[in-house]
Amino acid sequence: MSKIVKVLLLAFLAFSQMACSYINSTDDLDNQVDKLLAQMTLYEKIGQLVQKNGDHPNLDKMIEEGGIGSVLNQVNPDEVLRIQRLAVEESRLGIPLLIARDVIHGFRTILPIPLAQAASWNLTLVEEGARVAATEAASQGVRWSFAPMIDLTRDPRWGRIAEGFGEDPLLNGEFGAAVVRGFQSDSLYNPTSIAACPKHFAAYGWAEGGRDYNTANISESDLYDIVLPPFIKVFEAGAATTMTAFNEINGIPATGHAPLLRDLLRNKWNFQGVVVSDWESVTQMEVHGYTQNPKQSALKAMQATIDMEMASTAYETHLKELIADGKIEEKDIDDAVKRILRLKFELGLFDNPYGHTAEFPELLNPKHLNVAKTMAQESAVLLKNSNRVLPLSDDIKTLVVVGPLADAPHDQLGTWIFDGRKEDAITPLQSLKAMAKAKGIELKYHRALETSRSKNIIGKQAILNDVRRADLVLLFLGEESILSGESHSLANIDLQGAQMELVEMVATVGKPVVATILAGRPVTFERVEPMLDAVLYAWHPGTMAGPAIADLLFGVVSPSGKLPVTFPRHVGQIPIYYNHKRTGKPATNETWERLDDIPVEVPQLSIGNTSHYLDYGFEPMYPFGYGLSYSSFQISEVKIEGSKLSVGDKLIVSALLTNTGDHEAAEVVQVYTHQLVGSRTRPVKELRAFQKVLLSPDDSAHIKFSINTNDLGFHNPAMEYVVEPGQYHIWVGNSSEHGIQLSFEIIN
């Protein structure tokens, strides 16, 4: 038994002997909450609505006085135990603290970034990864995580695209729900569970220009049909809490948006969980120009039913005064306190505030590392593979590895890794060296650039000399972890620094060149794409990047990832996304008037024009849902059970998937629909279902999808959710651009 666990056990035994009149296991939860609330002073009630950072200078005093309900960013188990003892043993009522942390994609074992997890299209694996993260975090005293982030975005300039699940409502909802299930397990009371906090409610990913914290001007139809559906999914999965957003939505800051929070979330959706502000977003309403002072900010937040204020001081300073002024009632505070206390009871903090008395699994244990490795493998997307240069041939005798991201243990972890450590990370270079040695391959390495942003190539001649002697070049390109994440947006998403020049230099030799790209967003590299024989997009893969990438390059496993977001050819195409509208002048390759083909002084005409860019056309570099494999697959025998359906019926779609190649591999079968005519124009395609299936060569699998026709609806011009009768197309395929098309009709 570890020293920490022994201390926790002794603390638990001491606490179990304390007399707490409001704890009675025979009472139902509501009675326990009401009994405790009845004993609380107004100061103690307001204290439950206050969350402070772990380094707050008056932390101990506030805890002892009952002035804090939650502490974030404290993960030292000894310190967590110390402050929890202050709350339980020194404050008047002994109400335990709720310890919170941003556990975004792993705790000590770092998983691929969430955008990469979405590229796996494997819900079971992502849920398992969230279980790993929850278990490790809970072992250090954390019982509340500010994740998953389900801010749907169509703009890769936005740095926080790395934290979400891409551009599609279904993917964001399904993967968000998988994380909720993984965090919260079978019960919040499970000591290895942590409360999930889907964020940011809402439209944070709609930031103008992809610039973080920027204004979100969004139509009602996009808000209700694109942005909000993922939140419905995570709340159906039982998410215990949610967090507001920094942005304003059509002129009202999200943290004070009563129509969105009180009227929709609370009253219409009946969400009974805790709503927490983002960091200082309550007092930032004054900076927005929406409130005059912190007192008015506290009023707006309370009217919007914000239960807990993170970091700023409006609640603790002004709520008592607002009650005295008659602006709010004490009942408003009581309602918020009840929700917070209920969560603490559900987490078992009153029964055992000091943690579980049994041993937790070790951080970074083999099972956890294997989950991280598998996820890194399944999330990598093979974008190009000319002449089947991958997997690497057994005939290769010499390899040269080039690029700073081949050996960047910190950067491979990605954004938001508070508790990950670079010394635990295994880099691609380390794993490639080990594999090359085992296979008798000579391997040379050149960093070439100090960082991904460096503008000068180091050792050009030495690189060229080794490339000339090599059978193949492995380039590692991309971006450092600091270039994505919160407040790290980019106007230019090209490969940074001299990376394009590095590709061009290496390609002049004429040897096969394979690029592995590690990044927190889609990056643009069309200029050098023709020079690359293969491109493996590995995102920021986490702790086990090295073993995962080495296995992929050498063919131990086949890539099976699919893009959860559209890759533009040029930043000027943004926003570009698969589920766009058709417009009245849809473009085709035949109607694309190319810039270089326009005659001099040709007259301007409006006849026959279509929606495209003269220089970059209308198509992306790589479409949503796209991803290659070392094998090949055939989808056949696509059928619909019944071509005429009533609203509420199940749309049953089946297909036969066959592995027609020579590698064991997984394929993601995707189902899309399109409503031909509606009371609002409808997207050209919308993802409705998907399955990932692993098959050996020559094996087949019958796949069946059941889609509820109620899910095919949208909000009409009167903002009523409707499923309209009419003709629909349906596609079953392997990306948003390729599939077998059938039709069905919804009748009255």
Which positions does each model-derived feature cover?
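Edge beta-strands of extracellular beta-sandwich domains
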Residues: 740-744
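Glycoside hydrolase catalytic-domain context in secreted enzymes
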Residues: 17-716, 722-736, 747
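Sec-dependent signal peptide recognition
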Residues: 2-10
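Repetitive helical segments and hydrophobic/amphipathic motifs
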Residues: 12-15
